[in-house]
Regions:
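Membrane-topology segments of multi-pass transport proteins
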Residues: 1-20, 27-32, 39-299
């Protein structure tokens, strides 16, 4: 028996099975990680519906101020009454627990806060308007609001007709100009991060080449003149790219859009600052899957 076992070990078969098992476990772990990322990403990247509601909690003076909230539901939890009272909201202590919801309100440049807890008992008039817009911006995070108008160099070129619920002309104008701005931004990115980077790399190569000639004692007048000529050509290319950048920035900063956020706050947003715009409350499953895939791909 021991002889057979030793012979089996000597063939290397156990190590083959051990290696195969380790590879199988690694594959399962990788697949599990991908599934975990997909599930977690579903919550982060999925285009969620955006609600609009009125929120009217009492204050310490028993006064009620009604505010409008617009945002995405994130999570909810139960909280004891005493904790709510200690935060300055007088609630009925005879009710042991209250439900509260965490909303992503965005509009950080207007309110200073991206998220806020609200007590479910004081929320009313919840609705999901079809024309609510979500903007993903390069700065300040998400913006939530209603499109009012689109302007070119300060002149309004499209405006929402409040009497026509199904009128999407302003939205179509906005999305067309946003696509233009995104294309221009891609050109700017290419020049700044690729073309100019390539020039800087070549300039550095010339500097090292000149230094090598000097160390080797081969820095003749002709060699230095050749390097200087190449450096001048690169400077000319750089100046041409700078002129192109100035023109592209003027073009990309041309268009703006005016939005109305919660509580009738007006906000003018440059289309150059927008990465993506969509109206989630009127998106079907297919459109949301495409949006999810695009965001996941960027990640």
């Amino acid at each position: 028996m021991n002889l057979n076992l030793k012979k089996w070990y000597s063939t290397g078969t156990p190590w083959i099975w051990l290696t195969a098992g380790a590879v199988a476990i690694s594959i399962v772990m990788v697949l599990g990680l991908l599934v975990l990322l997909t599930v977690r990403g579903m919550n982060h990247f999925w285009p969620k519906d955006v609600m609009q509601a009125h929120y009217a909690p009492p204050n310490a003076q028993q006064e009620i101020t009604i505010t409008q909230v617009i945002g995405e539901f994130v999570e909810s939890e139960n909280i004891i009454a005493q904790q709510i009272i200690s935060s300055g909201i007088p609630v009925d202590e005879s009710q042991p627990e209250y439900r509260r919801e965490l909303l992503k309100l965005g509009n950080r440049d207007l309110t200073g806060a991206d998220f806020s807890w609200v007590l479910t008992d004081f929320i009313s008039d919840v609705e999901y308007p079809a024309n609510l817009v979500v903007l993903e911006r390069r700065e300040w995070g998400n913006f939530y609001g209603y499109l009012q108008s689109v302007s070119e160099a300060g002149t309004v070129v499209a405006e929402v007709n409040i009497d026509e619920v199904q009128d999407d002309s302003a939205w179509d104008e906005f999305t067309a100009r946003l696509e233009r701005a995104l294309a221009l931004h891609d050109e700017i990115y290419k020049i700044e991060n690729q073309d100019i980077g390539e020039i800087n790399y070549r300039v550095e190569r010339l500097r090292l080449q000149q230094r090598r000639l000097e160390l080797d004692g081969r820095a003749t007048a002709d060699a230095l003149a050749d390097i200087a000529a190449q450096r001048q050509d690169l400077e000319t290319e750089y100046e041409v790219l700078q002129v192109s950048l100035i023109d592209l920035y003027e073009q990309v900063n041309r268009d703006t859009a005016t939005f109305i956020a919660a509580n009738a706050q007006e906000k003018v947003i440059e289309l150059a600052d927008v990465v993506r715009a969509y109206r989630p409350n009127q998106m079907g499953l297919g459109a949301k899957l495409l949006g999810y895939g695009a965001k996941l791909g960027e990640f």
